[in-house]
Amino acid sequence: MGNMTVNALLEKTDLRTVTLPDGDREITGVYIGDLLSWVMGRAQSGDVWITIMSNNNSIAVASLADTACIILAEGVTLDEDVKTVAEMKDINVLSSDKTAYEIAVELSKVLS
């Protein structure tokens, strides 16, 4: 996987920005999952995390796992209070109307 930042990913895709406190964060992999306890133990530092989970607990998991960003799939959005927490914890959050699979396919092309 080539070196790419979250900012560069945004330039090469149609992903939307929800929060971007650390756009220079380097992406080193991709992880897909919605079961937070599972993601917490398996996502790697620097991963893009694709999920439909959009609550405060997902922000906490992204922080603990040190993911480069969260991509919310299928048009999922963040409530304003969750968005505020994401910004306070320096969690980049992007969104897409695509399914997790469609996002993963796009990322495999862009990140290779």
Segments the model singles out, each with a brief description of its role:
Residues 1-4, 112:
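Absolute protein N-terminus
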Residues 3-47:
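N-terminal first-folded block
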Residues 24-26, 36-48, 53-112:
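Feature captures the catalytic cores and cofactor-binding loops of soluble hydro-lyases/lyases
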